Amino acid sequence: MHTVFYVSDGTAITAEVFGHAVLSQFPLVFEQVTIPFVETLEKARQVRARIDEQFRQTGLRPILFHTIVDPLVREEVLKAQASGHDFLNTFVSPLEQELGVKAEPRLHRTHGMENRKLYDDRIEAVNFALANDDGITTKEYEEADIILIGVSRCGKTPTSLYLALQFGIRAANYPFIEQDMGALVLPTALKANRHKLFGLTITPQRLHEIRNQRRANSRYSSLEQCEQELASVERLFRQEAIRFLDTSSHSVEEISAKILEATGMRRQLY
């Protein structure tokens, strides 16, 4: 099994994202190691030694994805017995020529606190998502950018938090529960913010599997209950002309991207 190292003088998030995107094209399993904050020559030598040791143990040259600003630190890491792939410098040189401007590399610029306001906005969005999770309160819905609605366990909470953390979007979410199903209508708080509503749904079988992990062999997790709840909620979505998305086979990243595409909400990139 090949070992993949993600090495950076910052958080290594960029190296991980780039590396994961590339490696997903191959039908292989990799052992993955992330090493952030390699900011000194001493740390670089330790990383080099670790990579070389992995090569000696496995006989397979490790794959190295790196984003290192300091050229001396980068050169030391690249002395390792690995297949090195530099995400940043691959694109920086062509862009310098195109833009006619010399790049000014700086540590922690990508995922640091270069723009304090954007960082604060993101943290506030996360706090908002937590405070308005699962219908805890509906008093702050006027401040929401979006309100996700759907049955319990269809992906509302993780999507709300991802939208907040990744894009600084204030996302609330509201669950429809078994007691609502007899005569399902939009609650007053949702009606007042109807233009912010976005529905999430899921297949009955997938919902049954997820709920069964939480409350096995209960009415809540039974396939019949899942089918009934989903039928009622999807009927409401159609009656009220609320846009909705099936989350069954999508990751939280994909769900979020599809919501942004459908709503046209502005992304705040960090």
Curated annotation (Swiss-Prot):
Bifunctional serine/threonine kinase and phosphorylase involved in the regulation of the phosphoenolpyruvate synthase (PEPS) by catalyzing its phosphorylation/dephosphorylation. Keywords: Kinase, Nucleotide-binding, Serine/threonine-protein kinase, Transferase. It catalyses: [pyruvate, water dikinase] + ADP = [pyruvate, water dikinase]-phosphate + AMP + H(+); [pyruvate, water dikinase]-phosphate + phosphate + H(+) = [pyruvate, water dikinase] + diphosphate. This is Putative phosphoenolpyruvate synthase regulatory protein. ADP binds at G150, V151, S152, R153, C154, G155, K156, T157. Pfam families: Kinase-PPPase. GO terms for molecular function: ADP binding; ATP binding; phosphotransferase activity, phosphate group as acceptor; protein serine/threonine kinase activity. Belongs to the pyruvate, phosphate/water dikinase regulatory protein family. PSRP subfamily. Its EC number is 2.7.11.33, 2.7.4.28.
